[in-house]
Design a protein with these regions (language model features):
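Helical substrate-recognition/capping region of FAD-dependent monooxygenase/halogenase enzymes
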Residues: 1-196
């Protein structure tokens, strides 16, 4: 925690306290004020190493480990809805999510697209996002633009890599080269169920 964070959390002067209180009050309704809240890094997400709910396929050299928290990285825009996003965790909802890394959706095998579309309609749906360095790469799924390649680098992903994220935004499974036939067993494992 920095001294600036400490001063925000425990103001030393009446002016600092008035500033902090105004920021907190405005932050409830105005995004610009949220950026002024300085709470520091008061907690760190737990890495659930060796969790029986996690799976690893096709060995990675680096990236986010199964059981590890999804990093909050900048994403330019969601071109499926033309909505600016800002950061990856702002996109992820309360269900299972998938990140498919691809230079272009044309690089994704039709069998993979069919499997992911089927899983999106399953009893426990998985919503897949195509992460690409350019806009318009996805027509089947929500497209996330990783213009600088920051997200792909953090995940040690290449075109064809896939990450399955749990509802708590931790990695359930990852594939260096995605194999759709392994997705349902990995999802069952993440749910604590025996694979069929």
């Amino acid at each position: 925690i920095t001294s600036r964070t400490t001063n925000f959390l425990a103001p030393k002067t009446p002016v600092s306290r008035a500033f902090r209180d105004a920021v907190l009050q405005l932050a409830a309704d105005f995004p610009f004020a949220r950026a002024l809240v300085n709470s520091g890094r008061l907690s760190t997400a737990t890495i659930h190493a060796d969790s029986p709910l996690s799976s690893e396929f096709n060995g990675f050299d680096g990236g986010v480990l199964p059981g590890g928290p999804c990093p909050n990285l900048p994403i330019a825009a969601d071109y499926a809805s033309n909505r600016p996003i800002g950061f990856l965790l702002d996109v992820l909802g309360g269900g299972f999510q998938g990140l498919l890394f691809a230079g272009d959706e044309a690089e994704v095998a039709p069998a993979t697209i069919a499997a992911l579309r089927s899983l999106a309609r399953a009893p426990v749906p998985v919503e897949t996002f195509v992460v690409s360095q350019r806009s318009g790469a996805s027509r089947q799924f929500k497209g996330l633009v990783d213009a600088e390649g920051t997200t792909a680098k953090a995940f040690a992903a290449q075109s064809g890599s896939y990450y399955l994220l749990r509802p708590d935004q931790h990695v359930a499974a990852r594939w260096r080269n995605f194999d759709p036939s392994q997705l349902e067993p990995a999802l069952a494992r993440a749910l604590g169920k025996p694979a069929a």
